[in-house]
C-alpha cells in the first residue's frame, strides 16, 4: 500500500506503533475482506439475488507484542469487544488523514499464522471475524481535505446491511 498507512486498534491489545496519531496500535502491511452474493440468473424463469456472504478480515503484519495474545485469544475461543482499522494517506495541508475507517464489534480471532525468517523478519497473517462492522470512506478533495463520506454497516449475525 504505497503512500498509505494502515493501523489496527484492538480493545485490550497493544501493538508497537510509534506513530503519534496511532501510538501502541498494530501496524498493518496489508489487509483484505470482501463479500459475495450469488444469483439465480440463467437458472429458471426469473432472476434473484441471495443474501450476501461476507469474508473475514485478513491482515498481514510483522510479528509484534500483540502476536502471542492474539494466538491465546484464538486458542481459547474468546472474542475481542471492539476494534478499529484506520487507513490514511497524504492530505495536503492537513497532513496524513484517515480516509477509510472500519469499526468492528465482537470479533473472533479465526487465524494466526507466523511465517518468514529470511533476513530476520517474521510476518503474521491474522484473520478476524467480526459479528458487526461499519465501513466509512471519506472522499478527498483536490486540496487534500476530506470533503464527503459514504458508510455501510453490516451485521453478520442478522445477515443485514444498511
Regions found by a protein language model. Give the residues of each.
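Glycine-rich, low-complexity intrinsically disordered segments
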Residues: 1-162
